């Protein structure tokens, strides 16, 4: 497992521990190294992780390294963001989204 700042890299091996069994709500980004839009979201995701430390666990999964996870959640386009509570997928967004949209899919601005 690699951690970039406050963002945890998730794979099929550690998904259960990092996402399904997480005590905090989780925001999981599905991305690909070759994806330009994913690169555009990296600063937004890093800011979200920093500002929500201790309230939301931020993770990311590379669809090329963990295709089973992408398939399990029906991810066909990247970047894709899915929020989890109690290990269950809740809300999702796809594409380049503003910071506020990440708050909204995590249920932080209802």
What does each model-found stretch correspond to?
Residues 8-25, 67:
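A short beta-strand-turn-helix
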Residues 34-41:
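Short, thiol/selenol-centered motifs that function as redox-active sites or metal-ligating centers
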């Amino acid at each position: 497992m690699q951690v970039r700042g406050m963002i945890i890299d998730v794979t099929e091996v550690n998904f259960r521990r990092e996402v399904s069994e997480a005590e905090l709500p989780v925001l999981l980004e599905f991305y690909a190294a070759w994806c330009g839009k994913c690169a555009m979201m990296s600063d937004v995701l890093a800011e979200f992780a920093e500002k929500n430390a201790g309230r939301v666990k931020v993770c990311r999964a590379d669809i090329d390294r963990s295709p089973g996870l992408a398939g399990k959640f029906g991810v066909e386009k990247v970047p894709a963001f899915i929020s989890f509570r109690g290990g269950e997928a809740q809300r999702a967004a796809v594409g380049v989204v503003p910071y506020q949209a990440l708050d909204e899919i995590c249920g932080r601005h209802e």
